[in-house]
Swiss-Prot record:
Belongs to the RNA polymerase alpha chain family. This is DNA-directed RNA polymerase subunit alpha. GO terms for molecular function: DNA binding; DNA-directed RNA polymerase activity; protein dimerization activity. It holds the Pfam family RNA_pol_A_CTD. It comes from the Bacteria.
Length: 350
C-alpha cells in the first residue's frame, strides 16, 4: 500500500467573508484535481436560501408601478434578488414587509419568522414619498444554485403572486492556483491555494467544509464498488504520529505506583495503547484498582496528551487531590480515605 504524507490545511482571513486556504503538500497533479472539484462544488452545490416569489399589495404583475413609490415593481424585484437570507426550515416560509412613507425602505424593515435571518438589513429596496405605502409578502425557500423565475412559477398560484429569480448559492467567488512545493529532496509536490468569498449567511470555512462533505459522499459511490481496492493512503498527522508512538510505550514508562502497575500487569495490560482502550469502568473491575489508581492513570495519560476510552476531553489534573500543577507531580497519599482492609503501601509483586 502506498502511503502519502498527510497534507495540512491552513486558513488566512483576507477580509470579512473572504478567506484564503492553503492545502499542502499534495501528490503531483492532485492540486488541480482537488482545486477544480472544490471550486465547482463551492459555486454550484452549497445549500442556501432565497426569495422565490413576492406579492405586493395592490399589484397584479411586475410591469407596473406602486403609487407613492419611486421605484417601479421591476426595480423592487431586482433589489430583492440581492437579499441575503438564511433559513433553518426545509419548507417554504413567509416574511412580511410593511412601511409607510416618507423614507427609505431597507431589508431591515422586513419581519422574518423564527428560524429565518436577514443578513444585509442595510440593503435598499425602495423609496417612499409622503403618501407612499409598501406592503410586500415574500416567500423564502431553501435550495442550491440558481433557479430562474419561470421555474418558481407555481401552477394555481393566486393572482398577484410574482415569481422571482432565486440565487441560492451563498458563495460569491472562488479562485484557485497551484504552486510547486518542496518535501525533503522532492520539489514536484503541489500546493493548492484556494480563495473563497461568501455572502454574510455563511463563512468561507463552513462553505469549504460543506463542499468537502458533498465530494466525500459522491466519491464514496465509486469506493463502494470495491472497498478492498488498493489506493493511496494518507499518512497520520504529526499529532497522530506522536500518539501512535505513545501507544507502543510499555506501561513501565508511565512511572506508576507499584500497586497500579501490578494490577494492570495482572490484567494483561502491557502497553499504553492497551491502556487507553479501557474505560474507567473496565479498570474499576480490576481487583484492588480503585479511584486513586484511576486518577493516577488519568494524570499520566494526560501528560502524554491521551485519555481513557470514556474520559471527557475536559479532564483537569489540577482537580485531583494531591496534584501540583506547578511541578506536574502528584502526591499519591493526599486527599484519599482508605477503605476497609486497604493498604496503599502494599507492594505486591507479580
Amino acid at each position: 500500500m502506498l502511503i502519502s504524507q498527510r497534507p495540512t490545511l491552513s486558513e488566512e482571513t483576507v477580509a470579512d467573508n473572504r478567506s484564503r486556504f492553503v492545502i499542502e503538500p499534495l501528490e503531483p497533479g492532485f492540486g488541480y484535481t482537488l482545486g477544480n472539484s472544490l471550486r465547482r462544488t463551492l459555486l454550484s452545490s452549497i445549500p442556501g436560501a432565497a426569495v422565490t416569489s413576492i406579492r405586493i399589495d395592490g399589484v397584479l404583475h411586475e410591469f407596473t408601478t406602486v403609487p407613492g413609490v419611486k421605484e417601479d415593481v421591476t426595480d423592487i424585484i431586482l433589489n430583492l434578488k440581492s437579499l441575503v437570507v438564511s433559513s433553518e426550515e426545509d419548507e417554504p416560509v413567509t416574511m412580511y414587509l410593511r412601511k409607510q412613507g416618507p423614507g427609505e425602505v431597507t431589508a431591515g424593515d422586513i419581519v422574518p419568522p423564527a428560524g429565518v435571518t436577514v443578513h444585509n438589513p442595510e440593503m435598499h429596496i425602495a423609496t417612499l414619498n409622503d403618501k407612499g405605502k409598501l406592503e410586500v409578502e415574500l416567500v423564502v425557500e431553501r435550495g442550491r444554485g440558481y433557479v430562474p423565475a419561470v421555474q418558481n412559477k407555481a401552477s394555481g398560484a393566486e393572482i398577484g403572486r410574482i415569481p422571482v429569480d432565486s440565487i441560492y448559492s451563498p458563495v460569491l467567488k472562488v479562485t484557485y492556483k497551484v504552486e510547486a512545493t518542496r518535501v525533503e529532496q522532492r520539489t514536484d509536490f503541489d500546493k493548492l491555494i484556494l480563495d473563497v468569498e461568501t455572502k454574510n449567511s455563511i463563512t468561507p470555512r463552513d462553505a469549504l467544509a460543506s463542499a468537502g462533505k458533498t465530494l466525500v459522499e459522491l466519491f464514496g459511490l465509486a469506493r463502494e464498488l470495491n472497498v478492498e481496492a488498493e489506493g493511496i493512503e494518507i499518512g497520520p498527522s504529526p499529532a497522530e504520529a506522536d500518539h501512535i508512538a505513545s501507544f507502543a510505550l510499555p506501561i513501565d514508562d508511565l512511572d506508576l505506583t507499584v500497586r497500579s502497575y501490578n494490577c494492570l500487569k495482572r490484567e494483561g495490560v502491557h502497553t499504553v495503547g492497551e491502556l487507553v482502550a479501557r474505560t474507567e469502568s473496565d479498570l474499576l473491575d480490576i481487583r484492588n484498582f480503585g479511584q486513586k489508581s484511576i486518577d493516577e492513570v488519568k494524570i499520566k495519560l494526560h501528560q502524554l496528551g491521551l485519555s481513557l476510552k470514556d474520559s471527557p476531553a475536559t479532564f483537569d489534573p489540577s482537580e485531583v487531590a494531591g496534584y501540583d500543577a506547578a511541578t506536574g507531580t502528584w502526591n499519591s497519599d493526599a486527599g484519599y480515605d482508605l477503605e476497609d482492609n486497604q493498604d496503599y503501601a502494599e507492594t505486591e509483586q507479580l
